[in-house]
Amino acid sequence: MDFTSSSGVLDSERNTGSNDSDEPSSHSDVIETEELKLIKLQEHKNNLLRQRSELLDQLSQTRVVEPRSVQLDDKLLLKLLRRNDNAVSDSSQSSNNPLPRVLPSLNIEQRKKYLDITLNDVTVTCEKDMILLRKGSFTASFRIAVENESIRSMAIDLNAFEVELQPIIQYAEDTQNVNVAMMAVVQFLRIKELHEQMISKIVEASKFIRASNNTITLNDLEVSFHCYWNLPSPYPETLILTNKVQKILDFLIYQYGIQLGVIKYGSTII
C-alpha cells in the first residue's frame, strides 16, 4: 500500500489542526494583553490615590498661611522697637541716634521723642507712665517699670480682642518683652483687616453669606477665619476652619489660594 498519500493527508490534517490550535492561542494573548492593561491602569489609579492620601495627610499637619498682601510699614515699627546696647541718648542729639536697649520709661520726654509716631492708621503715644497703641477704637496700653535699663515689671491692657491676643500677651508678660508685645498687636490688627477684606471678596463672588465678623456660611456649611500664634514669633498666621471636611478645604486652599479655594470648597461640599 502506498502510505505516502495517507501520510500526506495525516500531515495535512496535523498542519490544519496545528493552525486551528493557533487561533485560540492568539485570542488568549489578546485577552491577556487587555487584562494587563487593566491591571496597570488599576495600579496607576491606586498610586494616584495613595499619593493624594499622603498629600492630604501632609496638608492636615500644615497650617495654611495667607501671604501678607497688605502693605506694611514694618521698617518704621522695627526702628521703633529694635534693641541697642547704647544708653539712652540725650534729647539734644540727633533723632537718628540708635534707640535705647529698652523703651525708655523713666524719662517721659525721652519716651515721647521715640514713641510719638503714627504708622499709617496705627498711632503709638505716651501718657504718664504708659505707652498707648491705638487703631480706630482699639487701644492697647503697656505699663512698664524700668530699673537700671531693664524692665522690672510690665502689664498690658486691651479694650478688645482679649481672647485672640491672649497667647502672645501672656508670653510677652511672662518674658517681659514689650517689643514682641507691641509688634504682635500691630501685626494682629493688620491681619484682622486682611481677613475682613478676604471675607468681603468671598461673599461678593459667591453664595456665601456673612454670619459674624470672622465666619461665613452657605446653608449648613461654615467657614471661619482665625489667627494662630506660633510663639515666640510676633507675626500671627491665618488659620481657616470649617464644620465639614477640613482636609478638602485645606487641599483646595493649597491648590487655589484662600479666596478661590474657599469658593470652590463651597460649591464642592454643597
Curated annotation (Swiss-Prot):
It comes from the Eukaryota. GO terms for cellular component: kinetochore; nucleus. It comes from Kluyveromyces lactis (strain ATCC 8585 / CBS 2359 / DSM 70799 / NBRC 1267 / NRRL Y-1140 / WM37). It is found in: Nucleus; Chromosome, Centromere, Kinetochore. Belongs to the CENP-P/CTF19 family. This is Inner kinetochore subunit CTF19. The keyword Ubl conjugation does not apply. Residues 1-30 are annotated as: Disordered.
